[in-house]
Curated annotation (Swiss-Prot):
Its EC number is 3.1.21.2. Belongs to the AP endonuclease 2 family. GO terms for biological process: base-excision repair. The lineage of its organism: Bacteria, Pseudomonadati, Aquificota, Aquificia, Aquificales. This is Probable endonuclease 4. Binds 3 Zn(2+) ions. Its cofactor is Zn(2+). The gene is nfo. Keywords: DNA damage, DNA repair, Endonuclease, Hydrolase, Metal-binding, Nuclease, Zinc. InterPro entries: AP_endonuc_2, AP_endonuc_F2_Zn_BS, Xyl_isomerase-like_sf, Xyl_isomerase-like_TIM-brl. Zn(2+) 2 binds at residues 143, 176, 213, 258. Endonuclease IV plays a role in DNA repair. It cleaves phosphodiester bonds at apurinic or apyrimidinic (AP) sites, generating a 3'-hydroxyl group and a 5'-terminal sugar phosphate. One of its GO terms (molecular function) is deoxyribonuclease IV (phage-T4-induced) activity. Zn(2+) 1 binds at residues 66, 106, 143.
Amino acid sequence: MALFGAHVSSAGSILKTFKRAKDIGAEVFQFFLRSPRAWYWKGVDKETKQAFIEKLKDFKNPVMVHAPYLLNLASPNEELREKSVKVFLEELKFCDEVGIHFYNFHPGTAKGISDEEGLRNVIKSLEEVFSEYTPKFTTVLLENTAGERGDLGKNFKELKEIMNVFRGIKLGVCLDTCHAFAYGYEINTKEGFENFKREIEKMVGLESVKAVHANDSKVPLGGRKDRHEHIGKGYIGLEGFKNLLKDEYFSTLPYYIETPKENNMDPVNLSVLREIYQNNDL
């Protein structure tokens, strides 16, 4: 059964995320542990941590933490790469300790180096992470990217290269619909969607996809820019989300919207997804 939710703010306290999710009718939710554009994190005090654990147990459905945007595990700058590994480790440990289901990250950006070198750096960084800490509960999700500015993980061949190194580690994929479409996957036609599924199955296996970031795209197919739009209002359109939500496998996953936040649109976007999912006439 598909579950629908959104990215919510953790401003003030991570405990506030549950109420913010409830207020928009979210069955699942995602949040940042720290400002996505800051390295510093004051951490979580013992009382807040315990309260969060209890709330999470009551919530039951999958909660996702998104890694900060500053992280770049692919960076040729050793100081930046090591800093990224440190933050990744810090957040992954916390997620695993409190029972967060998913820790999601962008593989990284190959700035000034080849994609191959960048992928080697990502693998090196993850080796450093997992040699120090192996999650027992939390699944680490690699998010596909739009391929903008050297972003890695833009296709499932690249994701496979990373994931194949870490057999036995709780790894999976978070499919971002906007990123996939902007890269060039034609998920809004029947034929394009079937080709897309075949590539996933061939490269990483459908079962590797554990969650979906449901976002329409402000850029056309292959536009290679990460620009999210409201569901049904962009170039993917309702057909793309219908392909996903009527599919035997993708209709079983949790969906997290990261659509523009203006005018309290989260409940509207969630209702559009639910209507597609529940209406057999569509």
